[in-house]
Amino acid sequence: MLIQAVGVNLPPSYVCLEGPLGGERPRAQGDEMLMQRLLPAVREALDEAAVKPEEIDLIVGLALSPDHLIENRDIMAPKIGHPLQKVLGANRAHVFDLTDSSLARALYVVDTLASDQGYRNVLVVRGESSQGLEVDSESGFALADGALALLCRPTGKAAFRRGALGGDPAQEWLPLSIPLNTDIRQVGDVKGHLNLPAQPGLPEAVRAGFTRLAGDFPQLNWVREEWFGQGRPDGRCLGPFELASQLRAAQRDRLDELLLISFDPFGMVVEGVTLELAGEAHA
């Protein structure tokens, strides 16, 4: 998979949560809709690559938060691909959404599918608007809100690898769950609850898993998500949106290929995919 261009848009407000899995994360406020973040991020990527919406062959959306995502607060679903297609005007694009998938796994699946279909311009978007979810106050875990857009060109050459978290192999990590509110009576009701138990050493285990997985590709530089503030100089963690600045830095450094590593909090594993990069001159 060739990354042609990157776009990102984050809320200006940050919320800091205490706890072993806490940190300072961008947080959507009030009546903000995810489309307010998605559309600028996508347009940034399209402008950078000089690609028009009608030239997009496939749109793939990834989101975890079951909240009001588009222009209407009554909409509640993690699917973002079709609403984005409509607003963007990408009328000839095929569309599907992936849920409970890491970005690394999604890019690998999309590369395989899209190359088989002969698609040329593929838009992969990752977005969160989680103000309708109760955060885990005990562990301090929350989702980072915002939008990431990757304009890709399938190559059919992506390699994928999954690995365990680092630390004690006998440790059984409890995964993230998002129990939904089954008694929603009005728009402002809580949609669900983020539940990732406070587990000592989890941030270190995730980062150790990243390092170990990267060791399987010693010839490649790697970029990674950052889900936890513990161990960070400023306590700030942008989740998958952390990748935007790293991918741009790799483009500036004229790297031709790298490894992107994601954390899957539902499977409690780390996953990596190899990517090719279009340089700044190409992008």
Swiss-Prot record:
Q: Which InterPro entries match?
A: Thiolase-like (IPR016039)
Q: What is its main location?
A: cytoplasm
- Supply one GO CC term from the record: cytoplasm
What are the BP-aspect GO terms? secondary metabolite biosynthetic process
An example of a GO molecular function for this protein is: acyltransferase activity
Which keywords, in A-to-Z order, does the entry hold? Cytoplasm
User: In which compartments does the protein localize?
Assistant: Cytoplasm
Instruction: Say yes or no: keyword Protease present.
Output: no
Keyword field contains Manganese: no
Describe activation and inhibition of this protein.
Activity of the complex is inhibited by 2-aminoacetophenone (2-AA).
Tell me the function of this protein: Required for the biosynthesis of the quorum-sensing signaling molecules 2-heptyl-4(1H)-quinolone (HHQ) and 2-heptyl-3-hydroxy-4(1H)-quinolone (Pseudomonas quinolone signal or PQS), which are important for biofilm formation and virulence. The PqsC/PqsB complex catalyzes the condensation of 2-aminobenzoylacetate (2-ABA) and octanoyl-CoA to form HHQ. PqsB, together with PqsC, catalyzes the coupling of 2-ABA with the octanoate group, leading to decarboxylation and dehydration, and resulting in closure of the quinoline ring.
Q: Which family does it belong to?
A: Belongs to the thiolase-like superfamily. FabH family.
How this chain assembles, per its entry, is: Forms a tight complex with PqsC.
Report the protein name in the record: 2-heptyl-4(1H)-quinolone synthase subunit PqsB
The encoding gene is pqsB
